[in-house]
Design a protein with these regions (language model features):
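Short, structured motif recognition centered on aromatic/hydrophobic residues
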Residues: 31-38, 109-118, 122-124, 150-151
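Acidic-enriched, low-complexity/disordered segments with a strong bias for Aspartate over Glutamate
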Residues: 38-41, 89, 107, 153
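The feature represents the first ordered module of a protein
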Residues: 46-113
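A structural signal for alpha-helix termini and helix-coil/disorder junctions
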Residues: 13, 78, 82, 156-157
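Mixed-charge, glycine-accented linear interaction segment located at domain edges/termini
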Residues: 120-159
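Charge-rich, low-complexity N-terminal segments
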Residues: 1-76
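Short acidic, glycine-rich loop/turn motifs
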Residues: 26-28, 99-104, 126-130
Length: 159
């Protein structure tokens, strides 16, 4: 069974509606997903952090991680904002992508942050920052269909 099917099955087993934080894990074909949910209903879910790990990228160097980041930039066009690489750190072997441009209103900026890291780890979170404040993690609200597509894209790019 594919990782997407594993996640879909796990989502279908969760009680709905639920606004209780819960962690969903799934594994298939050398890929592991941990999804930190803060809400689930029949149509959508909210997650604070999506963590993905791929054995195929376990020994990847910075150049291969940059290629993964570029592929994700091209595929993840359905998020609230487009994402693009903003920084890479060869010493720590990590590529950072963010919403470009972020979502802004009068007193708040919100954006996605995607890290492609050593060991085949990818993580996606959404942050918000009030004017004059520090950034805080916030929930990413997506339909179940978009969540499964996102996981499928991570799995495809990281294989």
């Amino acid at each position: 069974m594919s990782l997407v099917h594993e996640v879909q099955s796990a989502l279908n087993r969760l009680p709905i509606p639920s606004h209780t934080p819960q962690t969903l894990t799934a594994e298939a074909a050398g890929q592991h997903l941990t999804l930190h949910l803060d809400g689930v209903d029949s149509l959508a879910c909210g997650f604070v952090l999506l963590e993905f790990e791929s054995q195929a990228l376990a020994s990847a160097g910075i150049e291969q991680l940059k290629q993964v980041a570029e592929k994700l930039e091209k595929r993840l066009t359905y998020l609230l904002e487009p994402i693009s690489p903003i920084e890479h750190d060869a010493e720590h072997c990590v590529v950072q992508l963010r919403s470009n441009p972020p979502q802004r209103n009068e007193d708040r900026t919100s954006y996605y942050e995607l890290l492609v890291s050593r060991g085949g780890r990818l993580s996606l979170a959404r942050y918000a920052k009030q004017v004059g404040g520090v950034r805080q993690p916030v929930s990413s609200h997506v339909t179940r269909e978009v969540l499964l597509r996102l996981i499928g894209d991570f799995a495809q790019v990281a294989s």
